[in-house]
């Protein structure tokens, strides 16, 4: 690489260069009769480079290896003698060459590796190239990316063989997914861990763990500190924060679990929540194994529901439920006959 070549030749400076068909905007590498690098000429302003120099296709890649002591000496001698009135770092090469110090180029064959970024258009172009390389590496390793044009995968993401990434998915940070996962469409994973065989469409996961064969979504939201164990299900419009959902447990729909532990094979009814915040601090809800939760339950933490317990629909659970017991916390329904007629009579003096 650059550093190894620089050290081996004992150069004062070694600069990475490449050749471009259209070198517009790049500093040109000027070589002497012996083929050695003499200096780099900038082309920001018309007066800085001659027409002949502008025809040069070898350009400065913007990466250097310096002898630090030589660099310090050369920097003190730079002058803003250019159309921009600026100090140009590449002028150091001319100073060092004039002092008979070693000045060399390290050519790179692939020019895309050295594309410069001068504006947001350049930034988008470079990002697209980098993303294409990431996609190709994953696909050659056995990952299916259905629509690379709408899929973003960060450089540190790891994906297992036979995993499928559907369109409009964003895999960010240190996300890791095992083999045979189904990710997306419209899914975002940020620093998330997925085991093997996980399915996660239309969902948003941040700093969480999802173990083998778990099923998430659509429209699940997993927040930091969440662990979903093997074969568990977290379904539609479910938000889970700092909670542990046990193996084979089900949280199918319309639920908020915050600071909760749900035991293996338990079922949380639709429309249930854990009330975990008392206005000053958070408290945990502990739900045991094989618990049958009714719909529209509120678990007011701190509270514990024992193994094999049941909770009735519409209950607000504020006290612990013993193992195997049924927790009911609601008023029995009472029907008031003739209510509509009396209400209308009160409002407008009429009955029907």
What are these regions (language model features)?
Residues 38-132, 136:
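Catalytic-core segments of class I nucleotidyltransferases/pyrophosphorylases
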């Amino acid at each position: 690489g650059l550093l190894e070549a620089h050290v081996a030749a004992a150069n004062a400076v070694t600069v990475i260069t490449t050749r471009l068909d259209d070198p517009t905007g790049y500093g040109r590498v000027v070589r002497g009769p012996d083929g050695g690098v003499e200096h780099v000429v900038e082309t920001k302003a018309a007066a800085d480079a001659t027409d002949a120099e502008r025809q040069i296709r070898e350009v400065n890649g913007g990466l250097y290896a310096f002898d630090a002591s030589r660099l310090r000496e050369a920097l003190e001698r730079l002058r803003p003698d250019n159309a921009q009135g600026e100090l140009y770092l590449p002028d150091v090469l001319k100073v060092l060459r004039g002092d008979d110090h070693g000045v060399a180029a390290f050519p790179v064959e692939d020019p895309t590796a050295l594309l410069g970024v001068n504006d947001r258009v350049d930034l988008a172009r470079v990002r697209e190239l980098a993303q294409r390389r990431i996609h190709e590496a994953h696909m050659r390793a056995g990952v299916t990316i259905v629509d690379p044009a709408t899929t973003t995968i960060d450089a540190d993401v790891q994906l297992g063989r036979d995993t499928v990434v559907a369109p409009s998915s964003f895999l960010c940070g240190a996300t890791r997914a095992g083999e045979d996962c189904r990710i997306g469409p419209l899914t975002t994973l940020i620093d998330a861990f997925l085991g093997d065989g996980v399915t996660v469409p239309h969902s948003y996961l941040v700093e969480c763990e999802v173990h083998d064969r778990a099923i998430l979504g659509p429209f699940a939201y997993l927040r930091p500190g969440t662990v979903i164990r093997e074969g568990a299900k977290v379904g539609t419009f479910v938000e889970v924060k700092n909670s542990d959902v046990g193996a084979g447990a089900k949280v199918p729909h319309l639920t908020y679990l915050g600071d909760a532990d749900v035991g293996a094979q338990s079922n949380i009814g639709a429309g249930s929540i854990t009330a975990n915040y008392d206005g000053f601090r958070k408290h945990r809800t502990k739900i045991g194994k094989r618990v049958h939760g009714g719909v529209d339950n509120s678990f007011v933490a701190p509270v514990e529901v024992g193994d094999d317990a049941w909770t009735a629909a519409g209950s607000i659970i504020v006290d612990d439920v013993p193992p195997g017991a049924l927790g009911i916390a609601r008023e029995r329904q009472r029907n008031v006959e003739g209510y509509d007629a009396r209400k209308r009579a009160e409002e407008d003096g009429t009955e029907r």
